[in-house]
Amino acid sequence: MRMILMFDMPTDTAEERKAYRKFRKFLLSEGFIMHQFSVYSKLLLNNSANTAMIARLKENNPKKGNITLLTVTEKQFARMIYLNGERDTSIANSDSRLVFLGEAFPDET
């Protein structure tokens, strides 16, 4: 299953921008993938992982702004249509799992 997270936060003051950056870093550290500026998704193995993620989101909920969550099956997520100006090179629509062990890959020259 996939959790789709959409959020809207104010960024008018320095404090609001700091809260936005902190929340975004939290999402990335939890394994969310950015689809658009305020739309992220995360692959979840089962409903208990979904419940646990919701609890962590509640703990890290910013004081200002709105967060919307939608959980869909992999089949529903795979039917998502991406319309963009270039060829689709997104890995976000894949249900493949990647596991990186050890150090980062060397840069190709």
Swiss-Prot record:
One of its GO terms (molecular function) is metal ion binding. CDD domains: Cas2_I_II_III (cd09638). Its EC number is 3.1.-.-. Keywords: Antiviral defense, Endonuclease, Hydrolase, Magnesium, Metal-binding, Nuclease. InterPro entries: CRISPR_associated_Cas2, Virulence_VapD/CRISPR_Cas2. SUPFAM superfamilies: TTP0101/SSO1404-like. Its cofactor is Mg(2+). It holds the Pfam family CRISPR_Cas2. Mg(2+) binds at D8. GO terms for biological process: defense response to virus; maintenance of CRISPR repeat elements. The keyword Ligase does not apply. Homodimer, forms a heterotetramer with a Cas1 homodimer. CRISPR (clustered regularly interspaced short palindromic repeat), is an adaptive immune system that provides protection against mobile genetic elements (viruses, transposable elements and conjugative plasmids). CRISPR clusters contain sequences complementary to antecedent mobile elements and target invading nucleic acids. CRISPR clusters are transcribed and processed into CRISPR RNA (crRNA). Functions as a ssRNA-specific endoribonuclease. Involved in the integration of spacer DNA into the CRISPR cassette. Belongs to the CRISPR-associated endoribonuclease Cas2 protein family. This is CRISPR-associated endoribonuclease Cas2. It comes from Streptococcus mutans serotype c (strain ATCC 700610 / UA159).
